[in-house]
Amino acid sequence: MKRRKFLTHTTTLATLTILDPLKFGVVTDPVVHPLRLIIDADTANEVDDLYAIARALLEPRLGIVGLTSAQWHTNPRTPNDSVGESQRINEEILKLMGKSAIPAPQGANFPMVNEQRPQPSEAATFIIEQAMRIPEGEKLSIAILGPATNIVSAILLEPKIIPKLSVNYLGFWYNVATNTWSKREFNTNNDPNAVNVLLNTPNLEFRVMTATTSQHLVFEKTVMDQLLKGKGGIGDYLINRWETYDRFWKETDKEKTKWTMWDVAILEALAYPELAEEKEVMTPHDNLARTIKVFTKIDVAGMKANFYKAFSR
């Protein structure tokens, strides 16, 4: 996920070094009933998706039942097969982390052309199948890190899954004080029709981690180097992505000393609700008038500490 507005946040190496050393993937906070979750990501679009997915795969509070790939097309350097690129990276992450048994169906390569016509895909079919297996009274959580094409296509193809879903979307800008929304945001622009379906669907549980809130989670390259570089496997894979990705749209910080971890924020908030503040608000004025949930504040220090702990050796 890419944004054009970045907020500087300082993190010191001292914060990292005081954490107890752990090996990747060690369960330190066992949960009897982890959150049943599908992650849907436009992974190849940016850098933070990779960090978020890897972090989630190490989290015992999250029971990842699937990792689906998403398209994007508004980036001027978007490849013709954007979803294929996301799919490739998803599969590489799963392999590096020994998680290849987790299903990784591919999503649609194009956005919805209107609010009534879905884009069928393996990912949409997978979401339907998983949702239909959910026992009465329970829900399947979806974390959307990119455009909402796959999830909304699943809903349109099989509306029976609506009461079985808890949809969590990373997108929009939102002003808490004035209760005003802006849809001029990267994920939303990559499938505005899909987002409108989410907003306009009665009885769909819908929660948003806005760009306004998630922009505050900023990682420093020096800290990530100490945490991940030279460790092999997923650690070096993540560092390589940071170092080789061309952040062409950003005029400042050409050395890429910091990176905004939008996607990490939503997954940390789902795993650790105590690290975020949530509020019920009204939908945008041009959508069905109903209440949805919005994360209005995050504990940046707490989320960083969780990330460091998960990846420390």
Where in the sequence are the language-model features?
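N-terminal acidic, glycine/proline-rich low-complexity segments
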Residues: 7-313
